[in-house]
A protein has these predicted regions:
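Active-site loop segments of alpha/beta catalytic cores
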Residues: 7-11, 27-190
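Alpha/beta catalytic barrel-like cores
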Residues: 1-20
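Acidic/glycine-rich phosphate/pyrophosphate-binding loops and surrounding catalytic core
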Residues: 24
Length: 190
């Protein structure tokens, strides 16, 4: 929903039954109108701003996108009750994001990723290890392979319990929440 004087919001989850995954495929970025509008803008930026400023395409982390499609409370419940279905959804999302990364690479862009729902305060380190780390790792590695650039990542909240995962990502920048002791982050993460 796009209110005239407010921020957009999702009225109800798109995925109410995981049976829809049987018919879902990763988004074809070459045929998706909305993504093609982005591609046109990226083309202009790459020609006009190249070598002036760093260019990055912003993508959502797979877990946050899954929460937008399923609803946060339902996704968190299903991580316990239907983990195999959550993994199926995350795989489709990750494949779509890989296509977006390929497109960004065509324009010499790096990748900035935010995954606010992957906050350990919401999911804890064990769920992070199972449902976030493998997909984010896959995307950060893929970004370096396709773009030659490491990822800028933003993580909300108290992330101390997942630092052992964050250091394994291919990152050029890590944006942490204001509650984090930055001196400690420099010492432990770099």
């Amino acid at each position: 929903i796009y209110p005239k004087d407010g921020i957009p919001y999702i009225e109800s989850p798109y995925i109410t039954d995981y049976g829809i995954l049987d018919r879902m495929e990763p988004v074809n970025v070459k045929k998706n109108h909305r993504i093609q509008v982005f591609a046109q803008a990226a083309d202009i930026l790459s020609k006009e701003a190249e070598n002036l400023v760093p260019l990055e395409a912003s993508i959502g982390g797979p877990f946050t996108i899954a929460s937008n499609l399923k609803g946060v409370e339902y996704l968190l419940r299903d991580c316990r009750k239907k983990p195999e279905e959550v993994h199926r959804l995350l795989e489709i999302i990750t494949q779509t994001q890989m296509s977006c990364i390929e497109m960004a690479a065509e324009y010499g862009m790096g990748i900035a990723m935010a995954d606010p729902v992957a906050n350990p305060a919401l999911i804890g380190p064990k769920m992070y290890e199972e449902f976030v780390f493998p997909y984010t790792k896959q995307l950060t590695d893929y970004t370096v392979k396709k773009t030659g650039k490491k990822v800028s990542l933003h993580m909300c909240g108290n992330t101390y319990s997942i630092w052992k995962y964050l250091v394994q990502y291919e990152l050029n920048e890590l944006s942490l929440d204001n509650i984090i002791d930055l001196q400690r982050a420099v010492e432990k993460i770099g």
